[in-house]
């Protein structure tokens, strides 16, 4: 059994030779937390932003590869006076003219009903598609964008047409939305078309094509 003197020696800590050398004032550790390199912070921030932008861009490309967004203007050539006048003859002539559709679409945008034209054009694209895989994907996107009640671009369809679409979506085809397309076409014809003919948009086009009177 160790004597009291030996026990005291055992609890006095390591011998002087075993103790680590004391640090000088130059080697002392800083009292506060280590400072970060501002360049590292800048790089991390830029890297994070860059990654988020790239992820968003990849998602957008993936979506656009399935259903290409329609251009804001189908054509850029100005219509002839005769063509502009023909738009007042019938709604069919307006809708069969790429320029007429573009002008009418711009008018619908001012009435916050552009989704009607967008839906009609999307249905036209679907009917021209032959690849069944693409048909399935486009039909799903058209449904989500224009038929779903959760979509901000939902078009106005009656319950009968909606029920028919829900049944057809089990096996989509290029003609899944034919009834809905006709209903929206009729809505634009009866509701928006008469206002378009009296709008400043259409009247200005008529005036541009009117013959100028010459002064003597």
UniProtKB/Swiss-Prot annotation:
Recorded topology in the membrane: Lipid-anchor
Post-translational modifications: Fatty acylated. Heavily palmitoylated in the cysteine string motif. Phosphorylated, mainly on serine residues.
PROSITE patterns, alphabetized: RGS
A cellular-component GO term for this protein: membrane
Residue span of region Disordered: 1-30
Family matches, as Pfam families: RGS
Swiss-Prot/TrEMBL keywords: Lipoprotein, Membrane, Palmitate, Phosphoprotein, Signal transduction inhibitor
Stretches the record annotates as Interaction with GIPC: 207-216
Protein's cellular compartments: Membrane
Stretches with biased composition (Basic and acidic residues): 1-19
Main location: membrane
Stored SUPFAM superfamilies: Regulator of G-protein signaling, RGS
A biological process term (GO) from this entry: negative regulation of signal transduction
Start and end residues of each RGS domain: 90-206
Quaternary assembly: Interacts with GIPC PDZ domain. Interacts with GNAO1.
Name of the protein this chain belongs to: Regulator of G-protein signaling 19
Taxonomic source organism: Mus musculus
Gene that this polypeptide is encoded by: Rgs19
